[in-house]
A protein has these predicted regions:
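Short acidic (Asp/Glu) and glycine-rich catalytic loops that position anionic groups and cofactors
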Residues: 58-64, 188-190, 233-240
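Active-site-proximal flexible loops/turns
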Residues: 37, 89, 192-195, 224
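Short loop/turn segments at secondary-structure transitions that flank enzyme active sites
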Residues: 83, 87, 91, 190-192, ...
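A structural signal for short, well-ordered beta-strand segments and their strand-loop junctions
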Residues: 155, 178-186, 229-234
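Non-catalytic protein-protein interaction segments used by genome-maintenance enzymes to assemble
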Residues: 75, 160-217
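Metal-dependent nuclease catalytic regions and adjoining charged, substrate-binding loops involved
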Residues: 208-215, 220-288
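Metal-dependent nuclease catalytic cores that hydrolyze phosphodiester bonds in DNA/RNA
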Residues: 1-174
């Protein structure tokens, strides 16, 4: 039996004491300082306060608010477009209904008052009666249909749990889509703030080649499934592009991931406190 297959499997102390029960693509790629600040500090305190609040502790409400981390409009928009596009591609809903639902979700977003950037982007994204969102959904659907040509059904949000040699906890993730022998990952691009534009925004173009972090992410899924053709779909409000990733690129990405995980695990093993880890970091505050 797998060392990770039982819910009772013991998490090593050097992981458990830092609030890390598994790796994810985000945890692997993010800067070390962010990993500790987010997963070892903020999240455990937020969920502890939330549980206390649900159990009737009124004072915990302040802690919930303090440690909460509101999602950005770009994050919410990406999720909404993913869901809408796969629903359309699988024939489960119409384009108009999917767009309507995505917009209704995004219109509920209330940016944090301190997050001026998110306020500006939210106003821009929703200022044209949803046309930017609608056209991004259209481009994403076209990209999905191109990537999964011949698939009768695309399975979405499949959970993967991957074990790697020498790594004490598994990698857990969720695919965007899989069908007809293809593993597909969707990446949406949203207008970016630009001081050189009359509108204050510029189109965020789709990349001419697949980006390294995206290759590393989809390589995890291929490894977990034991094979498959990997394609990354990039879409914005104007265009889309589908990049098929070579096996050489995937293998190299997996090798680099294993190197990164071994480094991070050694840091966890050889430090006693979070302060010890933080002392190893050169913090770039733009990561936060």
């Amino acid at each position: 039996m797998s060392q990770f297959s039982s819910s009772r499997a013991k998490i090593p102390e050097h992981y458990a004491s830092r609030g890390i029960r598994h790796w994810s693509n985000t945890k692997i790629r993010c800067p070390l300082a962010y990993l500790i600040a987010e997963y070892s500090y903020r999240q455990p305190r937020y969920y502890a306060a939330k549980k206390a609040s649900e159990n009737g502790d009124a004072e915990a409400d302040l802690q919930v608010a303090h440690y909460a981390k509101p999602k950005s409009i770009n994050m919410l928009a990406g999720t909404a477009v993913h869901e809408a596009a796969f629903e359309i591609a699988n024939g489960k809903t119409s384009q108009s209904e999917a767009v309507r639902h995505a917009l209704s979700t995004l219109q509920e977003h209330r940016p944090a008052k301190y997050n001026k950037r998110d306020i500006t982007i939210t106003d821009h994204l929703l200022s044209d009666d949803g046309k930017r969102v609608a056209t991004t959904i259209e481009q994403t659907v076209e990209g999905i249909r191109e990537a999964f040509a011949g698939a009768n059904q695309i399975d979405v949000e499949e959970k993967i749990e991957l074990e790697l040699p020498g790594i004490d906890v598994p990698i857990i993730g969720y695919t965007d889509g899989r069908g007809a022998g293809v593993i597909g990952e969707v990446k949406t691009r949203w207008d970016r703030i630009s001081a050189n534009s009359k509108t204050g925004f510029a189109n965020n173009s789709v990349p001419a080649r697949a980006e390294l972090n995206d290759i590393a992410q989809i390589a995890l899924y291929q490894k977990a499934f034991g094979g498959g053709t990997c394609k990354i779909i990039y879409a914005n409000r104007i265009s889309h592009i589908v990049h098929e990733v070579s096996q050489e690129q995937l293998d190299e990405a997996m090798n680099q991931t294993l190197v990164q995980l071994r480094k991070r695990q050694r840091i966890l093993e050889r430090t006693e406190t979070m302060r010890d880890i933080i002392d190893l970091c050169e913090v770039d505050w733009s990561d936060f």
